[in-house]
């Protein structure tokens, strides 16, 4: 019995040491809850505009970010490594586990509730409302909310950057998805086969807008990730494109 007790104490000490070391190694403290059901179907759609996360390749390991982290949509697509902080709530954490999620949604503030009593996503709290599958990788279901340690990490994606062009006539809305590296975009421009480069403005989430007549032209994009890498993707959209169609490039971000 004493041997068992010794190893239990040792394991707890290692968890605390691990969390302390993580915090000192570029990790940030925050909190996490979960939503969306066991299959994460309730996380589809969202404020980034990705729609069906299954078909878009983002899968079930995703999260809605609090206002402080969402940054007006500029954080859409970013990847975060998250672990439950067992140094604070060992009874609710799955010690030694971590999960990588993609930011796909906004967890809106609830001003009717206090920041420490239900208003988990209120500024300035760094909070992740995780999909249930992601949550259950690191925490016990019954906990409801746990303290976490997190850091932004590199995103890995299969295939190239994708562009979906929606809109009408003199208004194009370009959804950019499947972004590797930093996962998110800080600037975009488009060039029609009959135009020069036209800067795009973020409309909402990962959707960027252009107020020009581009129908019937092949489209090229110049995209800068939040990591600072710029890709020029020439004629990825052929001149016969139609609104609502998605086109996949053969280029991808490293950072």
From Swiss-Prot:
UniProt-listed SMART domains: DPBB_1
Alphabetized InterPro entries for the sequence: Expan_Lol_pI, Expansin, Expansin/allergen_DPBB_dom, Expansin_CBD, Expansin_CBD_sf, RlpA-like_DPBB, RlpA-like_sf
GO annotation, cellular component aspect: extracellular region; membrane
Main location: secreted
Domain Expansin-like EG45: from-to ranges: 45-160
Gene3D superfamilies linked: Expansin, cellulose-binding-like domain (2.60.40.760), RlpA-like domain (2.40.40.10)
Protein localization: Secreted, Cell wall; Membrane
Domain Expansin-like CBD: 170-249
Signal peptide segment: 1-21
UniProt keyword annotations, A-Z: Cell wall, Cell wall biogenesis/degradation, Membrane, Secreted, Signal
Domain of life of the source: Eukaryota
Gene Ontology BP annotations: plant-type cell wall loosening
Bilayer topology annotation: Peripheral membrane protein
UniProt similarity note: Belongs to the expansin family. Expansin A subfamily.
Function: May cause loosening and extension of plant cell walls by disrupting non-covalent bonding between cellulose microfibrils and matrix glucans. No enzymatic activity has been found. May be required for rapid internodal elongation in deepwater rice during submergence.
Protein name: Expansin-A28
Organism: Oryza sativa subsp. japonica
